[in-house]
Design a protein with these regions (language model features):
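Bacterial N-terminal signal peptides that target proteins for export
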Residues: 1-7
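C-terminal motif of bacterial Sec signal peptides marking the signal peptidase cleavage site
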Residues: 14-17
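N-terminal pre-ligand scaffold of iron-sulfur
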Residues: 19-91, 105-106, 122-136
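Gram-negative bacterial Sec-dependent N-terminal signal peptides
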Residues: 8-12
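Short cysteine/histidine-rich metal-coordination sites, predominantly Zn2+-binding motifs
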Residues: 90-99, 111-123
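Short metal-binding segments enriched for Cys and/or His
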Residues: 104-112
């Protein structure tokens, strides 16, 4: 009887580990960004958005006001080896998984209708001193 209980417990744990709503996105190093650098010109205006080759699978950054920025990792939340891509129609404001088609709002990190996972994108904190954007 103990053998059956142990096997059943192990099977249940293994099944729970395969669920698609497991949120486990690691975060990566993000170096500060000088928004006056021409490379980051998209971030100089409110509403500007840019995907930086930083973080774990890239970081989408959007300037939401003069002093505020939102930053999310482009790794798919339930499978961090997959990098989300900008939507062909919506650009950097919507990120799409090339494998399953799941879509995420890059302004708040939320999954959109039809996403395989209910997990949100990994959110980075930001600070801005007027010249340098720090993402952590």
């Amino acid at each position: 009887m103990m053998y059956r209980t142990t096997i059943l417990t192990l099977l249940l744990l293994a099944a729970a580990g395969c669920r698609s709503d497991r949120c486990n996105t690691p975060f990566g190093l993000v170096e500060p960004v000088n928004i006056n650098d021409p490379e980051f010109a998209e971030l100089s205006n409110v509403g500007g958005s840019l995907i930086l080759n930083r973080g774990y699978k890239g970081v989408v950054v959007t300037r939401t006001s003069y002093d505020d920025f939102e930053a999310f990792d482009c790794a798919r939340p339930n499978d961090n080896e997959v990098a989300l891509q900008p939507d062909a129609e919506w650009g950097n404001s919507i990120l799409v998984c090339p494998s399953c088609g799941s879509r995420y709002n890059a302004l708040d990190g939320s999954p959109l209708d039809g996403a395989v996972s209910g997990c949100q994108l990994y959110h980075y904190n930001t600070t801005f001193d007027g010249y340098t954007l720090s993402i952590y």
